[in-house]
């Protein structure tokens, strides 16, 4: 049956050709698929997670950087304040040290030479002629000599308290001077330079003597008499002649007062 064989052959050849074409297309598709990586669900999830996590990390880094800069600025301000305080304290300390040093040098340079030192309170005790009851003195109520003798002076002070004298009346003043001549109360006269020229009783104690010695006898009779020296400026003879009548009377200016006993030979009374 040659008639149907022709159409069948043609159909068969067409099918074979179609199959070859289909095979070629499938191989191309397979090559394309193998060369191109198609993302799977897992890779997509990882990509999304990475993208999601990268966003907040950048924000955190920016916040941390800002906080660090603010912290550094605060630290710088604190350091500036501390530096200012340090300079102030250091400057004050240096200024105080210099002031103290200048004061010490000044006091050392102005200190009078010799072994005697100023002691105003002791000078008041030495010069005070006022009794405990408030007696008067030739120096007037406003003078330092007219001040009250402290309580317990005789028992606590190393200086001998001189006899209380009342200079209100001229007769009493003359009598007091006579008593001093006969009872000089262990007051010794020296030259103004402080050297012991002649040891004798000074009858003019309190009346222009430039330097006097106060004696103090210890409670123990075996102990020698201790002497304390005090130096005064001399007054003019006219001022010392009649203290009660002198309008220009002034207390002898204290120059020096001994702070320690001095060694002297016994006074020679005439």
Curated annotation (Swiss-Prot):
It holds the Pfam family gpUL132. Residues 33-62, 129-179 are annotated as: Disordered. Residues 1-27 form the signal peptide. Keywords: Membrane, Signal, Transmembrane, Transmembrane helix, Viral envelope protein, Virion. Residues 33-43, 133-147 have a biased composition (Low complexity). It is found in: Virion membrane. Residues 44-62 have a biased composition (Polar residues). The chain crosses the membrane at residues 84-104. GO terms for cellular component: plasma membrane; viral envelope; virion membrane. It is a single-pass membrane protein. Its main location: virion. Belongs to the HHV-5 UL132 family. This is Envelope glycoprotein UL132.
